[in-house]
């Protein structure tokens, strides 16, 4: 019996060994792709990317997470799943809005697709990258009178917002996974009067917000359109005028908050905010995140009457670019950081590179800004030809008579117009405040860290209006905010208070971080008070 059993065991053992050998050959090509995602640091979804990250500079494996969104026939249940295929260039992630499962919750590890927040009657979400859409084209979103499509569609509701062809670009492959029973949202108020939407709606607030993520090649004849090669992001709403934009390849200005629900209609049920807050409402801003995540600080505010560089406005609150929570810190996939402000940078450096273009909306005063660089505000070079001066985007509709004048007395002109050279001449480096009267409601802040005035970099004059909140939350000039004169240093630095010090004078304010150095440009010392 033993002799008859041995060959059978041998055959089984042989088959078993063969199976093991085959598995050993197949595993590296199949399971290793998913296992390697976490063994390879470049594929680790918990990895934090930085500007000189070898995974971004081509020294590491650039393949990362892409995700797909499934769409039901009614567009009411959109699920997200993770796929380890391909790089980010051809994937649909980032331009897909995903809702995890029928319970409406996002779970870490289930997918790394863009998660957006929308709320109110007639508001909806659309992800249109040419390869994946949320919802079917035959479904309509409530009372907004809009239909879904791969590009923008129009809405008759004046309270809805547009994030479509000329408005907002969501980074490809952005990821915002959250804890169980809650979802991470992106609040993006944009231009009123239009809505690019499908039928996927959920959220808390009452004003319609629509988010569309359109990715397409850049076009020179559409200067303000978002594109895959470096978007120009327009950001406006009931308060912020259309001249508020970020360009020059900057990532979109977005606000990320955790949403929790407790019985409100259409709200995902979830745990209460870790730092307080009303049920069913956005959690209050977290004070800060670890320095390893870029040292971002949340400087909150409850007034809708002011905005400063690097901050964005949504639903009556002001948040900084790149806002995220400590419980769900920023995550990224190779080549595609998940937070909207781009790789971790000093907030002070970001602020100082964004001169402010005051403009005025119909309702109240506003601050608009663009970064110095390719697109946006540019400075005239000394004697160089073809350099554009400071200008406002052609879509801003800000008349030159009401915009800031340079120290030479020449007003700003729309970018691309015949007059492209008005700028602050080298050696002056300050804007004239003559056209920035208080009566016009314009607000000017002094960007700290500007280099020497001889290089033509702008800084605001000592008479510029710094902010303080009035009883009604409206901005008022406050000389005590601490801005110092520009150009008073012989070392080529502009001694001025950091943006955090200025913000500290603005009331009401949210939590403050005790380390203002994260708001200073790299290599610059903090002024002693």
Swiss-Prot record:
Gene Ontology biological-process annotations: cell-cell adhesion; skin morphogenesis
Keyword Signal annotated: yes
InterPro entries: Corneodesmosin
Location (main, coarse): secreted
Annotated stretches, region: Disordered: 38-248, 383-492
GO cellular component, one term: extracellular region
Keyword DNA repair in record: no
Low complexity bias (residue ranges): 58-83, 90-100, 111-175, 189-231, 392-408, 426-441
Subcellular localization: Secreted
GO molecular function: protein homodimerization activity
Record's keyword terms, sorted: Glycoprotein, Secreted, Signal
Signal peptide boundaries: 1-32
Biased amino acid composition, Polar residues: 449-467
Residues glycosylated per entry: 172
PANTHER family associated with the record: CORNEODESMOSIN
Role: Important for the epidermal barrier integrity.
Designated name of the protein: Corneodesmosin
Protein source organism: Pan troglodytes (Chimpanzee)
